[in-house]
Amino acid sequence: MTPAEIKRLYQIIKVQLEYGLDELLPDHQLTKAPLLMRKSLFWIKNKHPEKPLGERLRLALQELGPVWIKFGQMMSTRRDLFPPHIADPLALLQDQVAPFDGQLAKEQMELALGGPLQNWFTEFDIKPLASASIAQVHTARLKDTNQEVVLKVIRPDIRPVIDSDLKLMHRMASIVAGAMPEARRLKPVEVVREYEKTLLDELDLRREAANAIQLRRNFEGSEELYVPEVFPDFSNETVMVSERIYGIQVSDIEGLEANGTNMKLLAERGVSVFFTQVFRDSFFHADMHPGNVFVKPEHPENPMWIGLDCGIVGTLNSEDKRYLAENFLAFFNRDYRRVAELHVDSGWVPADTNVDEFEFAIRIVCEPIFAKPLCEISFGHVLLNLFNTARRFNMEVQPQLVLLQKTLLYVEGLGRQLYPQLDLWETAKPFLEEWMMNQVGPQALVNAIKDRAPFWAEKLPELPELLYDSLRQGKAMNQRMDQLYQGYRHSKRQQATGKFLFGVGATLVVCSAILVDNAYEQLSIASGIAGVTFWLLSWRAYRR
């Protein structure tokens, strides 16, 4: 380790001890030395003993800085690995840090765009509109159209910090996984690797721009969701320019009510937007926390969601979508056998899983949920219960389902915050049933033909030639089959002849032995020679 890494490691340990996070260390032979060092070398006491462990963990991560804040946010979504008293406080982590110098931000933008900002923008505000751990946002106007825009720029000093902390995270995860077998259940190495991929993706604003363009295209003309326009000509790896929007933050209940917003419709549209993204588009915004969701102030009787920050998205293939929809329908019909079979059929759990035991485990965990009215049942917790149960049956981590679960919890939480009586199942069931009908009914056949139409249009001119080749190959194959059949029949005849000759030869040899005993020497010799001759003929017949 370099001196800088050692210094950073000491800072991390110091903060952890100040918040008493050594309590997270299990009672293990290997943890005795660190606990002894805590008392003998560091002399650092827990400064917040009155706070719950989960809250202390949140405060410690917040103090350690942006990389650890985002790591905590990701941990809060992995409820299959972390218990509620840890995951719930981590969900409150706020990704807000002090802004860096606006002049430095301007220089970074000009370096990325290849010229002075006044070449393309006017009214650039040196004061940031918002600041987060990865990037900072400033406002301006497009010079050609006078349209208001926001310029998002990656922090210039963030990459070395991220690389350094990620190295430490990987080292610590490897040590924990190697030294404590019982800790491997939490999969520390895989968790850090997943986090690294997510974090590095957020450092490339081209990815976010592409995601926003795709999401905007998917909901073009929709009354439910609006995604601000991105200007790709001014966007690259470290800078992204998009349309500036004005809206009411979705968590501002008082502001929404003061504006006369139809809260019931707004909540139901949130559910509709989620299921449309998942089942129609197979492409969903996976970071829909309240800071990224606004509501248009115009037409409050017909409210529209606004989605920002498309850095994290999820995708599902057609098999995942079908199994997910069938799982929901089977669960709410209390068909636990079907739920178990679907997990096996989808490959989410091993093929040799005992379906009877799996069904029983699902029933024990999920049946108490139905003691509540349907309007009080949480979709997100349904998924959580299913995945946690499946984990006991060696279900592999499905990253796309983890993102889906996190997003569903966000959407469900926002929906019930807006309209506490929201019946998520009543809103979602018609959508799921219609989607399933489209997958297995006549419409599914029509859709499949439409999807394959370009392929067949391309192959149509080649069809006569392909048909001729198929007929020619079929004729050649028939001839070959005839030859093989004739050879087979000839072989069977030869085998029958060989068996007959062998039997005659054996009979003559036996007769030869009998004749010797009865003093018919010459006849015995002749019979023996004839028997051997028939054996040779039978061997020759087999050879053919």
UniProtKB/Swiss-Prot annotation:
GO MF annotations in UniProt: ATP binding; protein kinase activity
Coiled-coil residues: none
Keywords: ATP-binding, Cell inner membrane, Cell membrane, Kinase, Membrane, Nucleotide-binding, Transferase, Transmembrane, Transmembrane helix, Ubiquinone biosynthesis
Pathway: Cofactor biosynthesis; ubiquinone biosynthesis [regulation]
Chain segments annotated as transmembrane: 496-516, 519-539
Localization annotation: Cell inner membrane
GO BP annotations listed: regulation of ubiquinone biosynthetic process; ubiquinone biosynthetic process
Domain Protein kinase: 123-501
One GO term describing the cellular component: plasma membrane
Sequence positions that bind ATP: 129-137, 152
Annotated catalytic residues: 287 (proton acceptor)
EC numbers: 2.7.-.-
Broad class of enzyme this protein falls into: transferase
UniProt xrefs under InterPro entries: ABC1_dom (IPR004147), Kinase-like_dom_sf (IPR011009), UbiB (IPR010232), UbiB_bact (IPR045308), UbiB_kinase (IPR050154)
NCBIfam families membership: PRK04750.1 (NF003404), UbiB (TIGR01982)
Protein name: Probable protein kinase UbiB
Source organism per UniProt: Vibrio campbellii (strain ATCC BAA-1116)
This protein's encoding gene: ubiB
